Amino acid sequence: MKRIFKYLMMTVIAAGTMFYSCETMELEDLTDPNALSPDLADADLLLNTIQVNYLGAMQDMQYNGAALGRISHMGGRVYYENFGGGTVSGAWGALYSGILPDIDAIELQNGEENLLAFHLGISKAMAAHIMMGLVDSVGDIPFEQANNPTEYPNPATSDDEVVYAGALALLDEASSYLSAAVAVTDDLYYGGDTGNWMKFVNTLKMRAMLTTGDYAGALAMTGVIDTADADMQFSYGTQELQPDTRHPWYASDYTTSGAN
C-alpha cells in the first residue's frame, strides 16, 4: 500500500511539473535566432560579405572575357556550347541575392549622423560595376522591379540603357557618400583610402561613358585610376587556421606541413 501511495504521489508531482512548464514556456516566440532581422545585422560584417561577393562576381565575369578572347583556356572549340544560360549565374546571384539586399540592410541602419557613409559609398560602387558587367554580358537584366519579391515575385527585365542609367545614379550616390565618409578598417581593397575609392568611381563613370558612346565626356573625365598605387586589388591574408584568409588556390595547395 505504501508503495502504491509513493508511486501515486510521484505521478502527481510529475504531472504538476509538466503543467507548470507548459504554462511558463513562450510557445508563441517564433523568432528564429539564426535569421535575424536586417536592423540587427552588423554593418561591418555586411560590408565584408559585399566585398567578398563582389570579388567572386568579378572573377567570374573576367574569366568569361578571358576565355572568349582566348587569353584563358575555354575548354572547347564552340562558343555557343561553352557559354550557356548559367554563364553569369555567379555574378547574378552575388548581385541580387547578396549585395543589393545587404546594401538595403546597411541603409536601414544609417541614421542622420551618416556614420555608415563609407560602407554605402563603396558598396554602391561595387554594385554599379556588377550591373554594368551583367548588361555587357547578357543585355537586359532586372532592375526597376528587382529585389521587391512581395510586389514583383518574377521581376521583368529592364532595357539595358535604363540599367546603365541606374548604375550611373548609384555611382553618383557613391561619390556623395564617399565625400562625407570617415574611412573604416574593414576595407579589403584600398585599406580605407577614400581618395582611391573616388578614383575607382570616376573610372567606372568613364567606362560607362565609353560604352554608351559619350566619348567627349570620357575624355573630359578626371580623377581616375592612372597610377599603379591606385590599382584596385583584393588583399588576401596569410592565416591558415579557420577562417583561412589566403588565396583559394594557395589554400588548396599549401599547408603548414608543405605542398599538397
Could you say what each language-model-derived stretch is?
Residues F19-Y79, G86, A94, P101, ...:
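Membrane-proximal, proline-rich intrinsically disordered regions
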Residues S176-F200:
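Acidic interhelical loop/turn segments
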Residues I130, S137, V201, A208-M209:
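TPR/TPR-like alpha-solenoid repeats
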